[in-house]
């Protein structure tokens, strides 16, 4: 029978004890995206949105989300993060729809990984862009959010293959 790591002997939720794990450098990279119309693309690119600089605000939201992941995900350990970066790149190949790709990188030196922090950062970044531009068009599409890679820890490294 499989033993669940987040359930105690009484069948109730618990946070995994990581006190015996080795301290290692851990990094995770996550991806999300948001597809917008041409008006929103131009507003973001030209920094003319009435709510302010969309990308700067979304970057800050992503950083804050990574730092606060343990308050959102019940069994996630609070971690001393050593680095958080949010990077944007436009895909203009399907104009008049434009996809903003979001890549987040989170690092720590600790006993557990930062995959959830990277995924939370990517999600919050996309949600913030939606929030700041929804007055223009509510039809935006937040795309797939997934882990691109992780390094460090007992389970080793992971690199998403293009066919995954």
From Swiss-Prot:
The active site is at residue 131. One of its GO terms (molecular function) is cyclic pyranopterin monophosphate synthase activity. Its EC number is 4.6.1.17. Substrate binds at residues 75-77, 116-117. InterPro entries: MoaC (IPR023045), MoaC_bact/euk (IPR047594), MoaC_sf (IPR036522), MoCo_biosynth_MoaA/MoaC (IPR050105), Mopterin_CF_biosynth-C_dom (IPR002820). It comes from the Bacteria. Keywords: Lyase, Molybdenum cofactor biosynthesis. It catalyses: (8S)-3',8-cyclo-7,8-dihydroguanosine 5'-triphosphate = cyclic pyranopterin phosphate + diphosphate. Pathway: Cofactor biosynthesis; molybdopterin biosynthesis. Catalyzes the conversion of (8S)-3',8-cyclo-7,8-dihydroguanosine 5'-triphosphate to cyclic pyranopterin monophosphate (cPMP). Homohexamer; trimer of dimers. Belongs to the MoaC family. This is Cyclic pyranopterin monophosphate synthase. It comes from Staphylococcus aureus (strain NCTC 8325 / PS 47).
């Amino acid at each position: 029978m499989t033993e669940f790591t987040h359930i105690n002997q009484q069948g109730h939720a618990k946070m995994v004890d990581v006190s015996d794990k080795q301290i290692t450098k851990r990094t995770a990279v996550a991806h999300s995206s948001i597809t917008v119309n041409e008006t929103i693309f131009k507003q973001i690119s030209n920094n003319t949105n009435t709510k302010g600089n969309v990308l700067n605000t979304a970057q800050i939201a992503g950083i804050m989300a990574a730092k606060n992941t343990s308050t959102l995900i019940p069994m996630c350990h609070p971690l001393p993060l050593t680095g958080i970066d949010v990077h944007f790149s436009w895909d203009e190949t399907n104009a008049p729809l434009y996809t903003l790709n979001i890549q987040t990188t989170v690092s720590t030196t600790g006993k557990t990984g930062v995959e959830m922090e990277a995924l939370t950062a990517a999600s919050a970044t996309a949600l913030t862009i939606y929030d700041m531009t929804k007055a223009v068009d509510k039809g935006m599409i937040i795309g797939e959010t997934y882990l691109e890679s992780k390094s460090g820890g007992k389970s080793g490294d992971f690199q998403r293959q293009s066919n995954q």
